[in-house]
Amino acid sequence: MSDVTQQKKRKRSKGEVNPSKPTVDEEITDPSSNEDEQLEVSDEEDALESEEEFEGENPADKRRRLAKQYLENLKSEANDILTDNRNAEEKDLNNLKERTIDEYNNFDAGDLDKDIIASRLKEDVAEQQGRVFRYFGDKLLISEAKQSFTRVGENNLTCISCFQPVLNKYTFEESSNGDKNKGRLFAYTVSKDLQLTKYDITDFSKRPKKLKYAKGGAKYIPTSKHEYENTTEGHYDEILTVAASPDGKYVVTGGRDRKLIVWSTESLSPVKVIPTKDRRGEVLSLAFRKNSDQLYASCADFKIRTYSINQFSQLEILYGHHDIVEDISALAMERCVTVGARDRTAMLWKIPDETRLTFRGGDEPQKLLRRWMKENAKEGEDGEVKYPDESEAPLFFCEGSIDVVSMVDDFHFITGSDNGNICLWSLAKKKPIFTERIAHGILPEPSFNDISGETDEELRKRQLQGKKLLQPFWITSLYAIPYSNVFISGSWSGSLKVWKISDNLRSFELLGELSGAKGVVTKIQVVESGKHGKEKFRILASIAKEHRLGRWIANVSGARNGIYSAVIDQTGF
C-alpha cells in the first residue's frame, strides 16, 4: 500500500552522533492537523454529552423527540426556501425602475410554508414506499454541462463506485472549513492491471484528486489448490467490480481471482478476504443495499451471493440463472435485480420471502419485421391489403444477451442489451413496458477491403450483403438516479445519453447527450450536492479501451483510459 505523496526518508550522515541524554521525540505538525484533532475531540465530546442527555428516556419519548426534530428540520428547510425566494424577489424589484404590487406578488407566507412542508412529507412517504418521487428531468441544463476528462495510469478501468453521505447537505466550501472527511465525496476505481484507486470528488469545479491506491500482483497467488484457502490479501487477476459501503467505512472489490476483498477506506489496507469457494466463482458485479451493510454479488457460476460486511460473513446463495450473472442492482428494500447475459432474463429476488420474479427478453427480428409490416399495411380501393416493401422497414437486431441493469425504484428497473435495446420494466408485467431500440446508433459500415478480396465491384457488393452486416452499439453501462425520472446510458459511441422517464412511468425519451466520452463506458455513477430542490449533479464514468469482460471491442477511435466527468445544474423554477 502506498500514498501518492509519500516522501523519502533522509539518510543519516556519518558526522551525526546520537545524543548522550535521552530526549523526547518531537513531531512536526502543521496548524491544520492540530485543528483537525481539536475538531475530532470536540465531536467526540458532543456525542458523549448527547448520549448522557438521552440515556434515561423510554422508547415513546425517543419517538416523540425524533418526530419533533424531523418537523424542525422540515421547517428550517421551508424557511430557507422562503428566504431565498424573498431575496430573489427583492433583487428583481431593485432592478425595476417602477415598483408595482400586483396580485401575483401578494402571497401568504404561512400558506407557502405549509405547502413546502406538505410536499416534503409526500416525498418522504414515497421514498419509504420505494416509489419515484423526484421529477427533475425537465429542469436539467444538459446543454450547459461542464465536462472534463481525467487520464489515469492504469490499463482499462473496469468499474467505478462513489461514496456519498446519506443526508449530504454540505457544499465544498462548508466541508473545507470543518472535519476533513465531513460531507466529502469519494470515488473508487479498479482496473485490469490489479489496481484499486481512491479519489476525492467533493469539489465539482475540479477534476478528481487521486489520494491513495493499492496494487495487486503475482505475489498474492495462493500456494494451495483448494478454493476455500484462496485468502491472500491482494488480487492476482483482473479486478472487475468495486462497491463502496453506504457508511463509508469499507470498499469491496472482486474479480477473476474468485474472492471478495474488504478494504478500509481510510488506508486502503485489506481488512477481510472472503473467497467464493467455487472454481467458476468469478465476481462480476457488486451492489450494496441502500443504507445497509448487506452486499449482493453476482458471479460467473450462475449464482448470487449475499453478505453482511460488518460481520464479514456470507449469508446465503441464490440460484436461478442459466448463464453468468453479469450485473446486479439494489436499492433500499431487501431485494435485488440481476441479469443473466445469454439466458436473456432479468430476475428480481425477494430475499426475505425466498422468491423470485423472472422477466424474459429476447427480440426476434423476423417477428418484429412481420409486426411492422402489419402495422404499416394499407388497404387499397379494391379492398386488397398492400404491405410495404421490406427495404423500407427499420433495422431490427436479435437480442443475444442482456448485459446491464439498474433499478429506478423498488418496482421499476431498466436493462441494456447487446443489440442496443434499453428496456423499461415493471414488476406488474413479464415483458418490457417500453423499449428504445438502437439507443446509441449503429456501428459504421465495414469497408469493401475488410469483407472481400474480390477485384470485381459487383461481387464485392454482393458479399457485403447490404444491411445484413450492420451491427448496433451495445449498451455497456446504465445508471438510474435512485427514485427519480432520470437515467444515463453509455456505450463506445463517443457520448453518454441522458433519458427522462415519463410521469406515468410507462415510457422514456432522450433529454440530451454528453459528448467527449471517447472509449468504452464500463460504469456510470452520479453524486449530488446542494440544497433540496436545487441539487447539482456530477456524472462520473469509467472509460477504457476494452470491454470490461473481454477484448471483443477493438480499435475504438480516440479511446483513452480515464474518468469522464460532467456537472449538470438545475433551473431555479
UniProtKB/Swiss-Prot annotation:
| Signal peptide region | none
Family annotation (InterPro entries):
Rrp9-like, WD40/YVTN_repeat-like_dom_sf, WD40_repeat_dom_sf, WD40_rpt
* Short name of any one Pfam family annotated for the protein: WD40
What keywords is this UniProt entry annotated with?
Acetylation, Coiled coil, Nucleus, Phosphoprotein, Repeat, Ribonucleoprotein, Ribosome biogenesis, rRNA processing, WD repeat
What the protein does comes down to:
Involved in nucleolar processing of pre-18S ribosomal RNA. Required for efficient pre-rRNA cleavage at sites A0, A1 and A2, and biosynthesis of 18S rRNA.
Q: Which residues form a coiled coil?
A: 32-106
Acidic residues bias: where?
25-58
* Alphabetized PROSITE patterns for the sequence: WD_REPEATS_2 (PS50082), WD_REPEATS_REGION (PS50294)
Q: What are the Phosphoserine sites (modified residues) in this protein?
A: S50
Name under which the protein is recorded: Ribosomal RNA-processing protein 9
Gene Ontology CC: one annotated term:
small-subunit processome
Report the SUPFAM superfamilies cross-referenced here: WD40 repeat-like (SSF50978)
